[in-house]
């Protein structure tokens, strides 16, 4: 049936546009998540003067920007990701980079007008303050430089008993990453 083949081809060629629409919709939805906002403590006058608030008296903590990956290494000891979004599009040094699933992938270390360089979690100098979601035990996630599919959770309490499948999140003690972003699973 010619009509069937035409519809399949038309569908195939529309996938790029459909994907772009879905990315934009996901970004819009992520930017509306309640965890991106914090209520203002009205007892602290300085905070209410400095922070920008919306009509519901809440302040935006995070804002998501979609970015196209234009380069990526994962076989070196110091791996980086390059994205096609820079200072002109709102990106700043030390911003966190996450993947479409919401897991962290690294931190922005260099920004020019239209591109940014991200230090990947697969970088020997990358260290992330982390915790096990189940029992809130804190530790540090690092890469050992060997297997790009495995990160190491170090410096956890000897009393901790991580189990296969446990979720590892960023901890509230991190100076670089917001708390409770997904890192991976044990």
Regions found by a protein language model. Name each.
Residues 1-17, 21-23, 28-38, 42-185:
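A secondary-structure micro-motif
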């Amino acid at each position: 049936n010619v009509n069937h083949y035409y519809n399949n081809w038309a569908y195939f060629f529309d996938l790029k546009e459909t994907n772009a629409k879905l990315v934009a919709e996901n970004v819009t939805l992520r930017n509306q998540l309640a965890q991106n906002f914090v209520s203002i403590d009205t007892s602290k006058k300085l905070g209410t003067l400095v922070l920008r608030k919306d009509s519901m008296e809440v302040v935006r903590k995070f804002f998501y920007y979609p970015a196209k990956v234009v380069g990526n290494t994962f076989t070196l000891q110091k791996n980086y990701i390059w994205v096609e979004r820079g200072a002109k599009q709102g990106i700043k040094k030390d911003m966190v980079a996450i993947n479409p699933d919401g897991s962290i992938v690294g931190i922005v270390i260099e920004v020019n007008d239209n591109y940014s360089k991200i230090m990947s979690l697969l970088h020997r100098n990358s260290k992330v303050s982390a915790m096990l979601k189940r029992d809130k035990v804190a530790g540090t996630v690092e890469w050992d430089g060997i297997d790009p599919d495995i990160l190491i959770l170090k410096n956890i309490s000897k009393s901790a008993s991580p189990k296969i499948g446990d979720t590892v999140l960023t901890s509230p003690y991190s100076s670089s990453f917001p708390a409770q972003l997904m890192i991976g699973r044990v």
